[in-house]
């Protein structure tokens, strides 16, 4: 399985802390640290008796990726020598949540844990990708099916905090989507911009938008849906049967429209949206909210890559302030 390229959309940050992580038994860290926990898992729980080949997989700039070939099949392994296990544990929980919807294909996570010499790893299903970009209509349909199937009674958020690219993503549960998106998504990114760049202008205007954005959600029924969270072209692939595969998630439960927030970096076409909305019908005011969900990702790019993305974020904020007369 090829790891997603992060060349345009994300770069690395050194540290992430997740709150109250309690991993599920499917991929819990081993109680006793072995010299090589990856090899140990593959040769025990992975049911292999020998590892025949280990090859590197290119494309990522945050983690190292490897293809482990064994007599019990293949495994895809990511490692990071500078970040603790919380990042990969969050990814594993997201992959598992998507996998359990039995809708769109995702790599099945097997194990995430700590490396004895520092850093962390995740072992997952190896998927052999095809060369085609595949059927966008099928991608749209299956994404909608995942949104429809992935429900929770806990509200908006996720079991743990995770990462968007390499930026911490706060997922504390909330019963109010407008509050959650304003505080945990836009507000958090605006604070990063102020703290990192001293950008009080975008911070103040952004908070004015947050305080006045409620009318954009009038007459909208918002149910928490399981979102991929970082759906751009580098995190979308197709298997040998030309079935869509989504990977490297930043999962949480939110408004389904928020999963289109990276559409400017995903190449979604008309067939994608037509197929999606046949399963998850478009709601009133969708077009007015579209840029609000782009804004989160433009702000994240600003925080990760610098001023090249500031103008796009500020333009969206200014347009909404005019629209809302705020």
From Swiss-Prot:
It catalyses: N(6)-D-ribulosyl-L-lysyl-[protein] + ATP = N(6)-(3-O-phospho-D-ribulosyl)-L-lysyl-[protein] + ADP + H(+); N(6)-(D-erythrulosyl)-L-lysyl-[protein] + ATP = N(6)-(3-O-phospho-D-erythrulosyl)-L-lysyl-[protein] + ADP + H(+). It is an enzyme of class 2 (transferase). The keyword ATP-binding applies. One of its GO terms (molecular function) is kinase activity. SUPFAM superfamilies: Protein kinase-like (PK-like) (SSF56112). GO terms for cellular component: chloroplast; mitochondrion. Transmembrane segments: none annotated. Residues 1-30 form a transit peptide. It comes from the Eukaryota. Keywords: ATP-binding, Chloroplast, Kinase, Nucleotide-binding, Plastid, Transferase, Transit peptide. Its EC number is 2.7.1.172. It is found in: Plastid, Chloroplast. The keyword Nucleotide-binding applies. The active site is at residue 230. ATP binds at residues 125-127. Its main location: plastid. Pfam families: Fructosamin_kin (PF03881). PANTHER family: FRUCTOSAMINE 3 KINASE-RELATED PROTEIN (PTHR12149), PROTEIN-RIBULOSAMINE 3-KINASE (PTHR12149:SF8). Initiates a process leading to the deglycation of proteins. Phosphorylates low-molecular-mass and protein-bound erythrulosamines and ribulosamines, but not fructosamines or psicosamines, on the third carbon of the sugar moiety. Protein-bound erythrulosamine 3-phosphates and ribulosamine 3-phosphates are unstable and decompose under physiological conditions. Belongs to the fructosamine kinase family. This is Protein-ribulosamine 3-kinase, chloroplastic. It comes from Arabidopsis thaliana.
């Amino acid at each position: 399985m090829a790891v997603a390229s992060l060349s345009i959309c994300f770069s690395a940050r050194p540290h992430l802390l997740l709150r109250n992580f309690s991993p599920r038994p499917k991929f819990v860290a081993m109680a006793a640290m072995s010299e090589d926990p990856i090899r140990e898992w593959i040769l025990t729980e992975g049911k292999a008796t020998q590892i025949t080949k280990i090859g590197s997989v290119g494309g990522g700039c945050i983690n190292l990726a490897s293809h482990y070939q064994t007599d019990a099949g293949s495994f895809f392994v990511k490692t990071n020598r500078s970040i603790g296990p919380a990042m990969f544990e969050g990814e594993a929980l997201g992959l598992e949540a998507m996998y359990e919807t039995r809708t769109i294909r995702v790599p099945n996570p097997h194990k995430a844990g700590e490396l004895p010499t520092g850093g962390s790893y995740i072992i997952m299903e190896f998927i052999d990708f095809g060369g085609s970009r595949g059927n966008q209509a099928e991608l749209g349909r299956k994404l909608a099916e995942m949104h429809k199937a992935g429900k929770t009674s806990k509200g908006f958020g996720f079991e743990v905090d995770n990462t968007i690219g390499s930026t911490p993503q706060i997922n504390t549960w909330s019963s109010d989507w407008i509050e959650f998106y304003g505080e945990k998504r836009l507000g958090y990114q605006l604070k990063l911009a102020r703290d990192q760049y001293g950008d009080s202008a975008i911070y103040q205007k952004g908070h004015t938008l947050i305080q006045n954005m409620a009318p954009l959600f009038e007459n909208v029924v918002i149910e928490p849906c399981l979102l991929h969270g970082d759906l751009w072209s580098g995190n979308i692939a197709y298997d040998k049967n030309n079935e869509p595969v989504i990977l490297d998630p930043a999962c949480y439960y939110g408004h389904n429209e928020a999963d289109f927030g990276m559409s400017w970096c995903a190449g979604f076409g008309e067939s994608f949206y037509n197929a999606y909305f046949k399963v998850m019908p478009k709601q009133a005011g969708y077009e007015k909210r579209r840029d609000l969900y782009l804004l989160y990702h433009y702000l994240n790019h600003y925080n990760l890559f610098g001023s090249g993305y500031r103008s796009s974020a500020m333009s969206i904020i200014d347009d909404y302030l005019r629209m809302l007369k705020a």
